[in-house]
Amino acid sequence: MGRLRKRFNEKGRQSGIQKMLNLKRARLHRSVREQESSSEVHANPEPDNQDSNAEILIDVPKEERQKRKQELKDQLLKENEGSISSKKKKRLDKYIENKLKKEEVASLIAKLAEERIDTSLLSSSKNLGKQATAKEKLKKSLLEEKLGLPLSDADSRLYKVVDVETTTTKSSTAETNAPEKYSTRSGFGFGFSTGTNESEITPNIKVLPPKKKKNASWGKMLNEDPEYDSAEEDYLSTDSEEFSEDSDNSSEENKDTNEPSTKDAEKTVPEDVVNLRSEQKLQPSFGHPEFENEDFDLETSEDDSSDDATERASRFKSWANKQILGADVGEKSHDVAPDNKIDNPDADMVRAQRMPRKLKMREEDVEPTADDIEIKGRKTTYTIINRPPEIQESRLALPIVAEEQRIMEQIFANDVVIICGATGSGKTTQLPQFLFEAGFSSPESENPGMIAITQPRRVAAVSIAKRVSEELTGFSSKVSYQIRFDSTINPDTAIKFMTDGILLRELSSDFLLTAYSAVIVDEAHERSVNTDILLGLLSRIVRLRREMSKSDQKVKPLKLIIMSATLRVTDFSENKLLFSVPPPIIKIDARQYPVSIHFNRTTKPDYLQDAFDKVCLIHKRLPAGSILVFLTGQQEVEQLCQMLRKRFVRSFRPLKSRARIVVSRKTMSVENEDLQSETEDIDQVPTSSSSSVTYDDESEPMYVLPLYSLLTTEDQMKVFDSSPEGHRMCIVATNVAETSITIPNIRYVVDCGKAKERVYNEKTSVQKFEVRWISKANADQRAGRAGRTGPGHCYRLYSSAVFDSSFPLHSLPEILRTPVESIVLQMKNMNIDNIANFPFPTSPGRSRLEKSLKLLSNLGAIDSEGVLTKLGEQMSLFPLSPRFSKMLIIGQQHGCLPYVIALVSALSINQLFVSKQSLLYDAHDKNSRSEETDLIDDDEIKQKEEYKNRMRGYFNAISRFQAIDPDAPALSLLSAVCAYDYASDKRKFCKENYLREKALEEVTNLRKQIIGLLKRYMVRVEKEFFKLQLKPPTSVQIKALRQFIASAYIDQVALYDKEKRGYVTLFPSGSEVVQFVPDRTYNIDSEYVVYLSLHESRSGRVYMSPLTEISPEHLARLAKNTTLLSYSKPLSYPPIRYLDNATKRECWVIPILSANIGTGSPSWNLPAVQIIQKRINGRWVNC
């Protein structure tokens, strides 16, 4: 019989019909609607048990609702006797309906409150996708078993399957012949009676192998108790199953007896042991409340109640806790062998047949010790060092010395180890000594190579090497250092400190680092580019050395130790590309005194003025101690130094003899409470502008020193000297004082919370300096400077809310902020073809790598397939930018090599001239004023006149150096370097010509280094080219130098636009036009200009630093064979001339210079040139 087929869109028609019926019903009178509704209720009575899953639910309590409504209405009418108007009746009906609704809601809530759902088997949504542990799976299975539900985990085993051959003979034999010397620990409360025949115990029992225990506390308890034998317990637990059938009745009688009789013990003990063993297997942890009251007895007896198992479990738990705590149980054991072993040999055979289970601790809970680390065949070699007592005492005060044993064990057991220790823990100076004393670098040991320690800064490498050589008394000749311009390496060197760039250079010649047995990478948390590349290479070298040592005994494994001052090591330890197995991490506590952190209530925009006010209050109110102020740049440092000197330095004003009482700061308390009370209103002090700063003759004098990277070495070393007597030292520094340098006696730190960073836009190649918030890790580093010698205080010039919301946790790695073409060239030289797959700790991104490869292709270092060319191989020999390396290689023409060396060195160092801002601060210095302004009495007028004179001399000096070629500003640097070499008094020469003496010293050192490299790799170079004092270049040499510069910067070309009155760059710069840097005057009238770099100012305008002008003909010749230059079709005139039977042709074409990056890049037509083309496979190709 067929079914009634549903019509199309039946539900839609039903809804439409229902709407029509509702509208029709709404037009009826209310009394008629009420009659119809009541008739419907009577016609369709609702059953008591209504299906809640039905599609339509009919309202059941309508009759009750009407009845209740009528009762309320009668009650209210009775209370309000008299006539009620129709309006009040309507309001009364509405009131009754609202009241009924409230009563229904209240009853519904009461019903819901009575209904409860068991949520024990429910899980939180946040744990979705998370794999449950064995303990959680067992707990869930037990609950499902208790509730009578099917087990969700099919692998869960709640019961132990035992096959027992129950024969009367074996049962009676087991009862009468129980082992005499088989006894358990006194904490169990069980004993065995003596038997006569022990050889008849041959039970036929199949026992499933138990699962491994995962309870660490149980394993620790067993390890702490030397008398406990886990195999004996397993033996007793398996024997007890033979007596399970005969022990049902006796268990009830003896459950409360700790020392039962011999007869009862024969029946009771095995059952108790089985119950306890079953409970032990089912309980994830002994103290869990959900399992303590459960009955997990696996015996077949039905008379044993859950109370017995609970009582026995509690007794076992109390014994286990007492054993863990080492307490005396109070019960004496009976018949326990002294060595806790079974004397019967037959019983030993039984035990071996039953394969007792041995309990082990989890690997993650075991802390490796010297006994746990297995080092096979290691030859022990050590070096004894006799240090003076004062050095030994200072070493013992360092936290890392206490961890020497643990550190060396991990180094011997692992090839890679990470050590985290805050600044001041002693890891940099002590770890090389640990390795040296343990036999590293000794020819007789298994690690005969040197110990290499890399530092990101040259100053740190030199200073640490000197410190380690002082501590290694008698072995000071074993410690050496090698930096860019200096080296003390000798044949006896065993510990070598160097910059990370030096080690990278050594990798290009010796990739396996066969001369080293251990490499220590220090300051890895700074994430410099060289450090990241070095770690990526070392991760592969360590693996290669380990594999090669297995087949060749001459090759020894390499040990890599990564040291970080912060806990930011997840980029190394959790990076599977670097280390497939995470290396162990050792954390060392720092020798740090407590530092109190004080935030501002509000963050003031003028942090320079706020820093001045803070320093003034600290100097006036707080006890003795040096002050360290962190600012963003040289300009702010000099300005604050000027304000503080004007306020507290007496040389600015004549001293006034005035009797006053001064409390010595040495006698003042340094307690935190006193300090808080003194600085309580520190944010409410009114600020004063720098122009209104006056000398304070009531305060003690202050010794103010600046510290930034552009200072001379002599001026930088002043911060390590002691201040004059009666003066408080105040050091105003940039972030150079944040790491590497430890300034003594710093008690107070004033932190502005900002730093000036160079931001590089990889799309536009525009650089700009931005003042940004530092990271939280850097803020902690700055605060830690105040806790080196004693309790200190750090005053942060920002609020805690800004610190929490605006400060990043860590700063970006340097590899994400700088160009990487130099690193890519070095990796190409190491035969690393696929650089994208290199194990960077933080990948720079595929786009940046492709951009660097394109630049190397334009420079001719690699071909179109990415293979290193001969020119690229020569460029990789120099520790310079690829642009400068190319200048050195092609600059051997016309005798220009000496000038190219000097020019490359000057461009590498850059900033040979002082900045215009420093001229303003020199004008305020009384010692640097000229004789012309001495006759002026007014200080402000005197400062303005002095500034004008200095600006006039500044531009005159630049004009003198540019006289060699006004169209090539880069040659002014060459002129300054050559003039410096001829100066007898170099300091006076730099001061008169507004040059930075420190920069020129670095240029001289770099020239010497480049000359040394050229002597090593280029034997054809004449000796005359290596002189430092050079004669002025000829006109031909000047033209050649300009082309050398343009060849190295062929992609950084700008064309002058007359309509826009500015230059347009070849690659988009983000600005329509760019202008010259306004620091100097340029006399360039050429159409095409090659520039050094682009800079964005605070106003958003883009400026360029020009190098030289270039003609379009030279530009077309230099851009040949690059992706920047293409040619048009042959011109019709002059006509084409065919050669060699029409296989070649000579024609004129228009060169087109473009960036070839798609839409938006300009293309410039250069003057037509004549070229020769050859026909290959039907196409004309340029020869």
Curated annotation (Swiss-Prot):
What molecular functions are annotated in GO for this chain?
ATP binding; ATP hydrolysis activity; helicase activity; RNA binding; RNA helicase activity
Which Pfam families does the UniProt record give?
A: DEAD (PF00270), HA2_C (PF21010), HA2_N (PF04408), Helicase_C (PF00271), OB_NTP_bind (PF07717)
Which stretches are tagged as biased composition: Acidic residues? 224-251, 292-308, 673-683
Residues annotated as domain Helicase C-terminal: 611-831
The record's region (Disordered) falls at 1-92, 165-315, 673-696
Q: Where is this motif: DEAH box?
A: 522-525
Q: Which GO terms describe its biological process?
A: maturation of SSU-rRNA from tricistronic rRNA transcript (SSU-rRNA, 5.8S rRNA, LSU-rRNA)
* InterPro entries membership: DEAD-box_helicase_OB_fold, DEAD/DEAH_box_helicase_dom, DNA/RNA_helicase_DEAH_CS, HA2_WH, Helicase-assoc_dom, Helicase_ATP-bd, Helicase_C-like, P-loop_NTPase
Cross-referenced Gene3D superfamilies, in alphabetical order?
1.20.120.1080, P-loop containing nucleotide triphosphate hydrolases (3.40.50.300)
Q: What EC number is given for this enzyme?
A: 3.6.4.13
User: This protein's superkingdom?
Assistant: Eukaryota
Can you say what this protein is called? Answer: Putative ATP-dependent RNA helicase PB1A10.06c
User: What is the species of this protein?
Assistant: Schizosaccharomyces pombe (strain 972 / ATCC 24843)
